[in-house]
Curated annotation (Swiss-Prot):
Belongs to the radical SAM superfamily. Biotin synthase family. Catalyzes the conversion of dethiobiotin (DTB) to biotin by the insertion of a sulfur atom into dethiobiotin via a radical-based mechanism. It catalyses: (4R,5S)-dethiobiotin + (sulfur carrier)-SH + 2 reduced [2Fe-2S]-[ferredoxin] + 2 S-adenosyl-L-methionine = (sulfur carrier)-H + biotin + 2 5'-deoxyadenosine + 2 L-methionine + 2 oxidized [2Fe-2S]-[ferredoxin]. It comes from Vibrio parahaemolyticus serotype O3:K6 (strain RIMD 2210633). [2Fe-2S] cluster binds at residues 97, 128, 188, 260. PROSITE patterns: RADICAL_SAM. The keyword S-adenosyl-L-methionine applies. Homodimer. Pathway: Cofactor biosynthesis; biotin biosynthesis; biotin from 7,8-diaminononanoate: step 2/2. Pfam families: BATS (PF06968), Radical_SAM (PF04055). This is Biotin synthase.
Length: 350
């Protein structure tokens, strides 16, 4: 099967209508043609700045517009981020993702963010950040610091998007993806299933992703985690078979991409997760929490991988024998060398 960038809604709907087993069989054939079988890439996601986000994403408990149990937190100090990254590496993660609840980062944030990137890279981990919208210059700064991936989800179809978010446009998201690509970074972009969207909207999301000039290197498919206090807390649950179908179709449409089984895994039993891996998912987030939502523990994941004969992929960055204390010393030196009086503990929530 060739890699394409001209998918139509009709083609995706045809895939949706295929018998379930036939669809999974096709997806598995594509997966075996383009991907390493029985291997899953493992990432860890850390919230480096939580809550008080000015945006109105109806699914998100970090929005300042909704009353949830999430308390706002300042930008995490670099040393704490590196400590979490070291623990993630020790637990088997190969990529460390850092997320901040912002509409976009401010210039005062950039030195701290670049120090985080450099410190995590020194550990031999791949790096990823999700910080909201970026300007071209901010994208270049992150790339120059060594950031490997930037996550910026499209969330849903262009047609349904306005029902979920009004504080930034769909084009804003596409523009940020262009800035990231132009800066030389890899793209992580996907969406959320279960927000009340139609089958046509799910098809539209995949068409938008698959028809980008270059497919995202990572495509996270999230199942909505309903949080009390958000406008979507009472939306209907996603049918598991519909979700698995979306994984399979994403694999068929974007055969070279990593398809990540992302948020919502805590609500999936082992059988559903196994079918997602059969359908072509080959990446997961690892650890007990994804930003602010629950995630299966490392032990549960390792037990499932063992049952399925799945081995997590090895670290793809250069091996690094630097001790944790030396890494922290490097960060302290970088901070001390900055021509600024800004404190690492400034309140980034305002």
């Amino acid at each position: 099967m060739e890699v394409r960038h001209n998918w139509t809604h009709a083609e995706v709907r045809d895939l949706m209508e295929k018998p379930f087993m036939d669809l999974l069989f096709e997806a598995q054939l594509v997966h075996r043609q383009y991907q390493q079988t029985n291997h899953v890439q493992v990432s860890t996601l850390l919230s480096i700045k939580t809550g008080a986000c000015p945006e109105d994403c109806k699914y998100c408990p970090q929005s300042a517009r909704y009353t949830t149990d999430i308390e706002k937190e300042r930008l995490m100090e670099v040393e704490r981020v590196l400590d979490a990254a070291q623990k993630a590496k020790n637990a088997g993660s190969t990529r460390f993702c850092m997320g901040a609840a912002w509409k976009n980062p401010k210039e005062r944030d950039m030195p701290h963010l670049t120090d985080m990137i450099k410190g995590v890279k020194d550990m031999g981990l791949e790096t990823c950040m999700t910080l909201g919208m970026l300007t071209p210059e901010q994208a270049k700064q992150l790339a120059n610091a060594g950031l490997d991936y930037y996550n910026h989800n499209l969330d849903t179809s262009p047609e349904f998007y306005g029902n979920i978010i009004t504080t930034r446009t769909y084009q804003d998201r596409l523009d940020t993806l262009s800035h990231v690509r132009d800066a030389g970074m890899k793209i992580c972009s996907g969406g959320i299933i279960g927000m009340g969207e139609s089958a046509n909207d799910r098809a539209g999301l995949l068409v938008e992703l698959a028809n980008l000039p270059t497919h995202p290197e990572s495509v996270p498919i999230n199942m909505l985690v309903k949080v009390k206090g958000t406008p979507l807390e009472t939306v209907d649950d996603v049918d598991p078979f519909d979700f698995i179908r979306l994984i399979a179709i994403a694999r068929i449409m974007m055969p070279q991409s990593a398809v990540r089984l992302s948020a919502g895994r805590e609500n999936m039993n082992e059988q559903m997760q196994a079918l997602c891996f059969m359908a072509g998912a080959n990446s997961v987030f690892y650890g007990c929490k994804l930003l602010t939502t629950p995630n299966p523990s490392e032990d549960k994941d390792m037990m499932l991988f063992k049952k399925l004969g799945i081995n997590s992929q090895e670290v793809s960055q250069k091996p690094d024998e630097i001790e944790e204390n030396e890494l922290l010393d490097r960060v302290v030196e970088r901070v001390a060398a900055r021509p600024t009086k800004d404190d690492l503990f400034y309140d980034a929530s305002v």
